[in-house]
Amino acid sequence: MITLFLSPSCTSCRKARAWLSKHEVAFEEHNIITSPLNKEELLQILSFTENGTEDIISTRSKVFQKLAIDVDELSTSSLMELISENPSLLRRPIILDKKRMQIGFNEDEIRAFLPRDYRKQELKQATIRAEIEGKHD
């Protein structure tokens, strides 16, 4: 099952939700503002990152700049507490399943969450369209 970690006021989060719904992809929504990440969720997210906290912390956020801290120096429990108290520190949306994670909304990258059969069918249709258009040139 896909989990969409979001904040309702975030434009990219709304785009991700709309895209998943439009493509009939089942997902569970988790509002990180009203229900901050627990330790297991944070550890799971971190396990998918290539650059650790650098991938998930929004360094451009007002909260981050106001705190003026080096998150790499924090222990896991301190980081957990900091994110729990300041959920807007996280880049959003975070889209996660058992095999992959995407941070932010990117229409090309989010396609990885479509079932393989769906992607094959779309590729087949695109190929047919390209062949038809090629005959008209």
Swiss-Prot record:
InterPro entries: Arsenate_reductase-like, Spx, Thioredoxin-like_sf, Tscrpt_reg_Spx/MgsR. PROSITE patterns: ARSC. One of its GO terms (biological process) is negative regulation of DNA-templated transcription. It is found in: Cytoplasm. GO terms for cellular component: cytoplasm. Keywords: Cytoplasm, Disulfide bond, Redox-active center, Transcription, Transcription regulation. It comes from the Bacteria. Its main location: cytoplasm. Disulfide bonds join 10-13. NCBIfam families: arsC_related, PRK01655.1. Belongs to the ArsC family. Spx subfamily. HAMAP family: Spx. Interacts with the C-terminal domain of the alpha subunit of the RNAP. Global transcriptional regulator that plays a key role in stress response and exerts either positive or negative regulation of genes. Acts by interacting with the C-terminal domain of the alpha subunit of the RNA polymerase (RNAP). This interaction can enhance binding of RNAP to the promoter region of target genes and stimulate their transcription, or block interaction of RNAP with activator. This is Global transcriptional regulator Spx. It comes from Streptococcus agalactiae serotype V (strain ATCC BAA-611 / 2603 V/R). The gene is spx.
